[in-house]
Amino acid sequence: MTKLWTSLSALHSLAGPVVMLLYPLYASVIAIESPSKVDDEQWLAYWILYSFLTLSELILQSLLEWIPIWYTAKLVFVAWLVLPQFRGAAFIYNKVVREQFKKYGILKPKVEHQAE
């Protein structure tokens, strides 16, 4: 049983960097090289949210140490953000981040240029 727990622990520790960094880095490079703008939006949104999550963790570190499932919850949330089936990063960006930036005047509305 100890070996099983050790193996699961090691897998859990390895899953974080793979899900949070390696796959998004690879997918971001592929997105930049593709002609589509849709995947660019997904990965820019992901890096914005991941940066915010990391900054929040730094600020709340002493509190998060008391939450035993924090790392697992973060791993599941980030997996939802990055998996192409869900496109969670683009969803959160469009529904939360963009709206808050507009609300506080940080993001100006797009102005359509008319042909002369």
UniProtKB/Swiss-Prot annotation:
Single Gene Ontology BP annotation: response to abscisic acid
Compartments in which it is found: Membrane
Expression induction or repression: By abscisic acid (ABA), cold, drought and salt stresses.
Transmembrane helix keyword on record: yes
Topological category with respect to the lipid bilayer: Multi-pass membrane protein
Transmembrane segments: 12-32, 42-62, 63-83
Alphabetical keyword list: Membrane, Stress response, Transmembrane, Transmembrane helix
A GO CC term attached to the entry: membrane
Main location: membrane
Source taxon at top rank: Eukaryota
Tissue expression from the record: Predominantly expressed in stem.
Membrane among keywords: yes
Family: Belongs to the DP1 family.
PANTHER family recorded: HVA22-LIKE PROTEIN E, HVA22-LIKE PROTEINS
Name the record gives this protein: HVA22-like protein e
Organism listed in the record: Arabidopsis thaliana (Mouse-ear cress)
Species lineage: Eukaryota, Viridiplantae, Streptophyta, Embryophyta, Tracheophyta
Gene: HVA22E
